[in-house]
């Protein structure tokens, strides 16, 4: 039996399916490429405020606005951001990946992978880290989204954990481990710990 090849949508296909099984809002046709679309970075980041992150507990964080003049990211820090765009996909698998132009500056995106699910809707949370200080700006074109056809039955996204997200989403791993959203972390002098680090 001949297998059906899994195919990536071209930029033209992406545009022709907008409003049907693909939603990208806002959409700018100038950001289409031959087989992807460039998504942009919103104007805010999130950083954790725990010296040790606990997978079984919600971890405290603070928000960092990205000013128009830019924000310098530092090595050794995990930054969470999100896309400006809200996307919705039906019957296709969306995948995002960092742009090579930023990788060549030492800025890397989502090392854990960015495989979406058919039926996902919301903004995308982005995991950013750099190998040397790098300055970023609000609404830069941060990543590319591609759409892949699915072979076989494709049930819509059933998980509500990150579905319908309109904000940066920190890890919710603690829910998978059976813990609730109560803050069980000890108070830590995060700024003092950073200042005292040799």
UniProtKB/Swiss-Prot annotation:
Keywords on record: Hydrolase, Nucleotide metabolism, Nucleotide-binding
GO molecular function terms noted in the UniProt entry: dCTP deaminase activity; nucleotide binding
Catalyzed reactions per annotation: dCTP + H2O + H(+) = dUTP + NH4(+)
Pfam family, one: DCD
Binding residues annotated for dCTP, in chain numbering: 99-104, 125-127, 144
Residues at the catalytic site: 127 (proton donor/acceptor)
GO biological process: dUMP biosynthetic process; dUTP biosynthetic process; nucleobase-containing small molecule interconversion
Keyword flag Nucleotide-binding: yes
Secretion signal, residue range per the UniProt entry: none
Enzyme type, top EC level: hydrolase
Protein name: dCTP deaminase
Species this protein is from: Rhodopirellula baltica (strain DSM 10527 / NCIMB 13988 / SH1)
């Amino acid at each position: 039996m001949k297998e059906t090849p899994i195919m990536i949508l071209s930029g033209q296909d992406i545009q022709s399916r907008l409003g049907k099984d693909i939603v990208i809002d806002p959409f700018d046709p100038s950001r289409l490429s031959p087989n992807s679309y460039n998504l942009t970075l919103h104007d805010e980041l999130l950083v954790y405020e725990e010296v040790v992150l606990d997978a079984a507990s919600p971890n405290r964080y603070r928000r960092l606005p990205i000013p128009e003049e830019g924000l310098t990211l530092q090595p050794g820090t995990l930054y969470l951001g999100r896309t400006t765009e809200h996307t919705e996909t039906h019957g296709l698998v969306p995948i995002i990946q960092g742009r090579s132009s930023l990788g060549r500056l030492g800025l890397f995106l989502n090392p854990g992978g960015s495989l979406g699910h058919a039926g996902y809707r919301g903004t995308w949370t982005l995991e950013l880290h750099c190998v040397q200080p790098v300055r970023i700006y609000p609404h830069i074109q941060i990543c590319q989204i591609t759409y892949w056809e699915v072979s076989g039955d494709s049930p819509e996204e059933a998980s509500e954990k990150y579905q319908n997200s309109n904000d940066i989403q920190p890890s919710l791993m603690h829910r998978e481990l059976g813990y609730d959203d109560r803050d069980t972390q000890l108070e830590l002098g995060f700024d003092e710990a950073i200042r005292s680090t040799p």
